[in-house]
Structure formats: structure tokens, C-alpha cells
Regions:
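Sec/Tat-exported extracytoplasmic proteins
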Residues: 49, 68, 72, 76, ...
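Surface-exposed short loop/turn segments
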Residues: 96-141, 207, 243, 247-252, ...
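C-terminal/domain-edge helix-coil "capping" segments
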Residues: 17-38, 129, 140-260
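Positively charged n-region of N-terminal signal peptides that target proteins for export
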Residues: 1-4
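Short beta-strand->alpha-helix linker/helix-N-cap micro-motif
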Residues: 29-103, 119, 123-127
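Bacterial N-terminal signal peptides
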Residues: 6-15
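Stable alpha-helical elements in mature extracytoplasmic
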Residues: 60, 64, 68, 77, ...
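Solvent-exposed, acidic/flexible segments
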Residues: 53-65, 83, 99-103, 112, ...
Length: 260
């Protein structure tokens, strides 16, 4: 049963919690060789919003950890566990998804992935106020070593996420300089809520399409890919300069058409 719970973490992650390698930045604040960086895993963030707003902001269960991973990668101190690595672990286990998981199982997955730190959290939106909480675990000891939280107006989500990243870095064994903090705060994906939600809804759709293709359900996968394209286009309507959405849309355009 424990292994099944461990696999559940992997399935949740594979369905929408890890940023794609292509979405991660190339330029970093610190020039540390890749082999010397700290391995780190970021799990999904639970949407704890009230029912009337939960569905609207559901894409941020994927989006917030993706933004966090992008910012942590941009520091140049961490190796973020990739989606492909999680698929490798899942293939090695060869079990089926059942039930929900707790933090103990999540830490166990971190060990399998050879991560040093594990991040998980949740967010809540009430009356246009956004609160994001994150917990930091040491995979080696299996205990929580820190926590951080930010609260503010939802239209400042991009600033809140970056403040959260800055707040958690101390638990990850580093302290950013004033200049590094300033540069991190200035590197904003988008300031548009609608653009962000549409983009990450598209990314979630692509993840689900990948799973369907593996299952041989190509017709449904094609529908999801078309939905993803529409979401990326909608994101760019809200923010024409949204580089992540542009890359996602360009990736679809360059992809080899599915043979049905």
C-alpha cells in the first residue's frame, strides 16, 4: 500500500506539477556548474480556495509550482527535478495510481529521485486576496526544515510568488544578495492573471494529452492539444509579450502532427 501511495505522488506530479525543461531559463544569477548544484523537487500545490473560486484558479495548482521552479532554476544553485526524471521513476516502479498521499510518501519519492530538498504547499484565494504557503523538507532526514507564506492582492500574484521564493531560499542553504533579489523580482513572466491562468490551463491539457497518447487514446489526446493551443492563444490575447505562452504555442506549431 505504501508503494501505491508513493506512486500516487508521481502521477500527480506527471499530470501537472513539474516545469518542462524548455520553459526553464538559460541565464542564471550565479554561474555554478550543473554537477555542483543542489538537487531539488517541487511538488504540486493544493488549491484550498473556496468552492466559488476554486475552479477558476485551478490551473495555478500547476502554475504556481512551475513559476517557483523557474525562479529557483534562475538562481543557478539548484537542479530542478525534471518531468522526464519523474517518468523514469514511475516506469521503474510499474504500479498503478490509487488514493491520495501525505508528506511522508512525498519525501520517499524525493529519496528515489535523489533530491536533497522537497517543496510542497498550497494556495487560497478569498475575496481577491491570495495567500501562498510552502513547506521545505530535508529528504535525507525526512523532516520539515522550514516554512514560508505570503499574502496580498491577487493582481500582485507575480510579486507574491517571487517574495515567497526569496523567503524560502534561506531554508535551502543560501541567502540572496540585494542585487540578486532585485534581479529576481524584475524577471516577471506576466502580470496578467488571465494570461497566466490560460497558459497554465494549456500546459495541464498538454500533460493530459501525453498520458492519453501513451494509453493509445489519440483522438482524445488530439482534442486536448487543440484545447491547449486555444488556451495559449487566449493567454497571448491578454498579454502579447508573454514569452512562456509564446514558447508553448511555438512548440505546438513545430510538433510533428499526430497520425490517427
Amino acid at each position: 500500500m505504501r508503494i501505491l501511495l508513493i506512486l500516487a505522488v508521481l502521477v500527480i506530479l506527471l499530470s501537472g506539477c513539474a516545469a518542462t525543461d524548455s520553459a526553464l531559463p538559460v541565464n542564471t544569477l550565479r554561474q555554478i556548474p550543473r554537477e555542483e548544484r543542489v538537487p531539488l523537487m517541487v511538488l504540486n500545490f493544493k488549491n484550498s480556495s473556496l468552492k466559488n473560486s476554486a475552479n477558476e484558479y485551478q490551473p495555478w495548482e500547476f502554475g504556481i509550482p512551475s513559476m517557483i521552479m523557474t525562479d529557483l532554476e534562475s538562481i543557478g544553485l539548484f537542479n530542478i527535478l525534471s518531468w522526464e526524471r519523474l517518468k523514469d521513476i514511475s516506469a521503474q516502479l510499474k504500479f498503478q495510481y490509487q488514493g491520495m498521499v501525505d508528506e511522508d510518501q512525498a519525501v520517499e519519492v524525493g529519496r528515489l529521485a535523489a533530491a536533497r530538498f522537497l517543496l510542497t504547499g498550497n494556495f487560497m484565494i478569498i475575496r481577491q486576496t491570495l495567500r501562498i504557503e510552502v513547506k521545505v523538507f530535508s529528504v535525507e532526514s525526512g523532516i520539515q526544515i522550514g516554512a514560508s507564506a505570503v499574502t496580498g492582492k491577487i493582481d500582485q500574484f507575480f510579486e507574491l510568488e517571487k517574495k515567497l521564493v526569496i523567503g524560502m531560499t534561506a531554508y535551502l542553504g543560501t541567502v540572496l544578495t540585494v542585487d540578486e533579489k532585485s534581479r529576481l523580482l524584475q524577471n516577471v513572466e506576466t502580470t496578467s492573471i488571465d494570461a497566466s491562468l490560460n497558459n497554465y490551463a494549456g500546459e495541464v491539457a498538454l500533460r493530459k494529452a501525453d498520458q492519453l497518447k501513451v494509453q493509445g487514446r489519440k483522438d482524445l489526446a488530439k482534442e486536448l492539444i487543440q484545447q491547449a493551443q486555444a488556451k495559449f492563444e487566449k493567454a497571448l490575447e491578454h498579454d502579447p509579450n508573454y514569452q512562456r505562452a509564446k514558447k508553448n504555442l511555438a512548440g505546438l506549431a513545430m510538433a510533428v502532427p499526430m497520425t490517427l
